[in-house]
Amino acid sequence: MAKIAILGFGTVGSGVYEVLCRNAAGVSRRAGEPVEVKYILDPKDFSDHPAAQLFIKNFDAILEDPEVKVVVETIGGTRFAYPYVKACLESGRSVCTSNKEMVATYGAELLALARAHNCAFLFEASVGGGTPIITPMHQCLAANVITEVEGIVNGTTNFMLTKMVRENLGFDEALKIAQELGYAETKDPGDDVDGRDACRKIAILSSLVCGHQIYPQNIPTRGIRDITVDDVAAAEKLGCVIKLIAWMKRGEDGSVAAGVEPCLVPKANQLAGVDDVFNAVLVKGDMLGDVVFYGKGAGKLPTASAVVADVVDALKNGVKVHDSLFWQPAEPVEGMLTDPAPAAYYVCVEGIAPAVAEAIYGKGHVVEEHFDGCSYFVDSADDKALAEAARKVEAMGGSVKLVLRRLPEDA
């Protein structure tokens, strides 16, 4: 019998326990042996819980019990989770986690520890929640050189942007609804709306694609706080919707570019129709072409189901999974992983006339005129040209309020 310990009994941790109880027979059959939770580590009081006898507050009890084969980490963050996970791997116990911050920051180190101590470190739920993406990329797409990953990986901001489009709501109104429904944190929604959550996820996928650690701090990241109802209306005029896009590209020379940013997505693009709390990740392979992974990116039971699937994988395959699921350590690079390629852009400027905007930005057209400025569609520009245009706008007493890249239609 395989004994399991769960670290943290919040939304995901309690979901893992529920999945293991409700689907015990199927999980055990697939794992090849009975699977049972022996410990649940959490500092809170669960004396009234039906499984009260499983709760402990001493982490060392798990390390000292030779019966525990797999540890599920759902604490979140890195302050406690990282040392706990490190200790478990060093003791030869496999770890399954949904902790994107830990994987994005310490993934290479923890993968190496798993290899060194003949166990597994698995994290399917860290990117897609309940939507499989890690396993398909390192197993099913193993015959491909992956050149690009692009997608919607944060359900909260996608829900908010959907509300802003469908109901003509402002950012604050959409955020309030997301908080009331439990999609966004009430105290500090910054991880979602400022793009940090999406940044960690694309850092993990970039590390997997490139074979070495890509750090979140090297990925240019912008959230959706600056998006207004006027921008949503302008996007509609251009035949687009606004989505928070996480992306990475790998050049033929091995160069890497990555980013998280709100973008104009043409309605013909596959990502344009991904609404509400759903996520979608488009992966480009040199042999397969484009493949899209779609589903709910969060939620108690969807995320827990991915964690439990990792538990089964750890019990069946152990360290063998790291024949394909692995990346090397690397130091953070200097600067940001920007993409030098030109693209079409939407810019919103204040304090200058439309004719002046046209003279500064070049070939394109005015989308909307405002009382104190305009929005302008630039047919083609790169980062250098946009920066130079912004300097000219500011020199004339104006300001650039928003810049959105437009994705191609055929993605």
Indicate residue ranges for each PLM-predicted region.
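Conserved active-site and cofactor/substrate-binding residues in soluble primary-metabolism enzymes
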Residues: L7, T11, G15, V35, ...
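Substrate-binding/catalytic subdomain of NAD(P)-dependent oxidoreductase enzymes
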Residues: E173-G273, F278-A280
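A conserved regulatory-domain signal marking ACT and ACT-like small-molecule sensing domains
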Residues: V311-A411
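N-terminal glycine-/serine-/threonine-rich beta1-alpha1-beta2 phosphate-ribose binding loop
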Residues: M1-S91
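A short hydrophobic/small-residue beta-strand
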Residues: S94-C96
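Rossmann-like NAD(P)H-binding beta-loop-alpha module
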Residues: V68, R115-D197, I204
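Rossmann-fold NAD(P)-binding glycine/threonine-rich loop
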Residues: A81-A87, S91, K100-H138
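Catalytic, metal-anchored helix/loop core of enzyme active sites in primary metabolism
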Residues: I146-E150, N158-L161, V165, Y183-G190, ...
